[in-house]
């Protein structure tokens, strides 16, 4: 691998810069079995065989039994961020296979704390996986995380971090950006204490990604764009999904002001994802496509060419409103209200447009209030603009 990477222009010094380590550390990676930092091993495989995901999966699987306890901990995080959950299962099995007899040996080596932390990380990462693969609703995820948080009082830093990240994502998925921001500020000092810089950087990337959403929804568009470009231009960031999110969010920041720029950035996000290699990236692609379709519907671009099958139910109602088919829109939104027990900020806005008149005005006012309560001062402009017609 080392020789092939060199022939492709990735000398040990260049890899050292990319990995943010010394070139002697990179030399030792290739000279000592099992010496690799797991993140750097995965990145080196991607540089070695960029178009062969099965090759990379095969070698990660082969290396898993040889990983140190610290690398097993890092592997849980890295594979979660890549969305490679079958490989993460292999890592989890390796962690869970530690018997009491082995634990006694590890105590003598001074590894018992890391072994214990790894065992406790497994259920926390399993919960993150449910969210990433869309096998749990935002409400169910929130309730599950809340219950875990109350029942498990963690004190070890890594466990606290993943537990709080689960909590942040639970508020994030419900659109409560005020709580997201509060927990981010609480968590940052803990993350900065992590000694393993690749693990620390991965956690910080998660925080950066969520901060983009917070800044965007607080209508701090320049700040949001700056963070996006930090993620995009970070040479040490090898996560496809975070770069895709960053491009999409730059595009989203232009949703109301510049249709063409918004469209170009969102299409760049789709290019980064390419043909999704796992379920997490499939879902990421669906979300980008949905945002792109929202952009087209909002600006009324080629509405009759939009495939209804590509839209989720709420956006279908938005399209029907723009096409003047208000009754269809109302029917969809009433079904959503019956299923979920409430309408989201966006759905209240769509209902306001569809119903019209004084009743429509009330829905628009509820939408504005809902956006305000959740701390979304970017999309609040939707009901605000619509309400101007009533003045």
Q: What is each residue range found by the language model?
A:
Residues 1-167, 171-172, 325-329, 359-362, ...:
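Flexible inter-repeat linkers and adjacent short helices
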Residues 2-9, 16-17, 25, 270-276, ...:
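C-terminal non-catalytic interaction modules
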Residues 79-101, 130-148, 172-191, 216-230, ...:
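Helix-turn-helix repeat elements of alpha-solenoid scaffolds
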């Amino acid at each position: 691998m080392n020789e092939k990477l060199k022939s492709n222009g990735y000398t040990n010094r260049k890899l050292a810069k990319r990995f943010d380590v010394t070139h002697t550390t990179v030399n030792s990676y290739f000279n000592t079995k099992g010496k690799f930092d797991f993140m750097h091993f995965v990145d080196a495989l991607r540089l070695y065989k960029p178009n062969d995901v099965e090759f990379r999966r095969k070698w990660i699987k082969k290396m898993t039994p040889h990983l140190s306890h610290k690398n097993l901990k890092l592997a849980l995080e890295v594979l979660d961020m890549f969305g490679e959950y079958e490989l993460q299962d292999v890592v989890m099995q390796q962690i869970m296979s530690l018997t009491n007899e082995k634990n006694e040996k590890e105590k003598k080596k001074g590894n018992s704390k890391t072994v214990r932390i790894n065992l406790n990380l497994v259920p926390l990462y399993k919960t993150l996986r449910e969210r990433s693969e869309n096998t749990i609703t935002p409400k169910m995820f929130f309730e599950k995380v809340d219950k875990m948080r109350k029942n498990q009082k963690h004190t070890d830093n890594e466990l606290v971090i993943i537990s709080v990240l689960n909590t942040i994502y639970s508020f994030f998925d419900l659109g409560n950006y005020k709580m997201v921001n509060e927990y981010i500020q609480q968590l940052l000092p803990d993350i900065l204490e992590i000694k393993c810089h690749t693990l620390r950087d991965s956690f910080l990337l998660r925080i950066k990604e969520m901060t983009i959403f917070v800044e965007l929804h607080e209508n701090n568009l320049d700040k949001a764009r700056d963070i996006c470009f930090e993620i995009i231009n970070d040479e040490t960031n090898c996560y496809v999904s975070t770069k895709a999110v960053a491009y999409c969010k730059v595009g989203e920041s232009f949703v109301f002001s510049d249709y063409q720029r918004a469209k170009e950035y969102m299409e760049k996000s789709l290019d980064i994802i390419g043909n999704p290699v796992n379920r997490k990236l499939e879902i990421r692609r669906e979300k980008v496509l949905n945002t792109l379709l929202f952009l087209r519907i909002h600006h009324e671009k080629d509405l009759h060419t939009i495939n209804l099958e590509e839209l989720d139910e709420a956006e279908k109602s938005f399209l029907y409103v723009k096409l003047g088919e208000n009754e269809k829109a109302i029917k969809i939104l009433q079904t959503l209200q019956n299923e979920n027990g409430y309408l989201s900020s966006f759905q209240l806005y769509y209902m306001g447009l569809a119903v019209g008149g004084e009743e429509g005005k009330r829905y628009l006012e509820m939408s504005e209030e809902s956006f305000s309560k959740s701390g979304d001062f970017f999309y609040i402009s939707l009901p605000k603009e619509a309400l101007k017609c009533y003045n």
